[in-house]
């Protein structure tokens, strides 16, 4: 690239730009550095910009470069933004409805069928049921190799681990052979809702001449399956495309006049400070699939939390409704974009060895940052700063160490997982400090270490 004149990153908010395995980097930061070295412009494009990009534009500069925000409030041509309707599932329940689909969504689907149009439905949970639960003892079958609940898949009658891929044969109630692995009761019931169950409900609801196409990680495992399903949707006269987040962006079908979100609450309540931002991105992106042709589009979002800032922001097509609330919370809790965040992950088959090493690393980090608190292994994520309390003002001038603590997913693929979260002021040389501390801590046989600076995944 001898004569680089312009760098463009499309959909810059995408988490996939952050490399999760070694070498760990963010493509946005690499591109920004490259642009400075070559003296060229960097354009970040997104309908839902990241909090980091917005903060830099608000400040006007970052790392010696000028940042400017340019907005395009209207769609190109004559197309207008779709109307967003929020269906309150609490009212649906009180009115006696037990259907997967609210009355507004049912009416909208009927209209799509009548006019021979197309619809896109988002449900970000693959499988048939989220999990199985014994109605007598409360047991939820978990993976033998991970600390995660197993997802039930109706087509194959299996419980599958979406962490390691393990699969177990099962017969849920009321089928013959149903048995709880703990108490033996036959009342092993399906709980929660997956895309397979929504697909079955759609096929029972809609006329046979309406194509129902499911697109998720299970239906797109084979080579070319993704493209084949999209071609089926494109060729159909009237169709409903049901899928997980993979259908939320990049689809441009003028015949799609309806987008439905089966349950928006799944994305809102993840144990992650970026959960709100990711939920807004997902909902706003999928809403953009409607009304891209001559016919106006509608979006129906089903939720038990209609007053959440994220839901209100999507309804109004106004990110600021959510952003102001989200950034206030991040500023108060000291999360990016107001601080730098690093995640030190330690894992191994020997729980004691992994625990010992993560404690040693935490001790060395305190030495590196000049903190004198004795490390303690906390039982849950972010229970405190290892015995040291800092105010927001103090943190801006010195790092803070949270943990060590077991990860949210405590065990994966037979390996016990612990982590340390480090918060530091903007401009702090986190990489150098972490490298020095980890090097002094040494290693343990069979125990691995991963250091993720400016981390996105804390699970």
Where are these regions (language model features)?
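Acidic, glycine-enriched active-site microenvironments
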Residues: 436
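Residues at or immediately flanking beta-strands
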Residues: 149, 211, 400, 448-450
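Intrinsic disorder/low-complexity segments
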Residues: 170-176, 371-398
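Conserved short beta-strand edge segments in small beta-sheet-based binding/regulatory domains
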Residues: 371, 440-455
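Inter-lobe coupling/hinge segments of SF2-like helicase ATPases
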Residues: 1-355, 359, 395, 407-410, ...
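Short amphipathic alpha-helix segments
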Residues: 355-372, 395-402
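Short proline/glycine- and acidic-rich turn/helix-capping motifs at secondary-structure junctions
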Residues: 396, 400-413, 450-459
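Short amphipathic alpha-helices within nucleic acid-binding modules
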Residues: 430-432
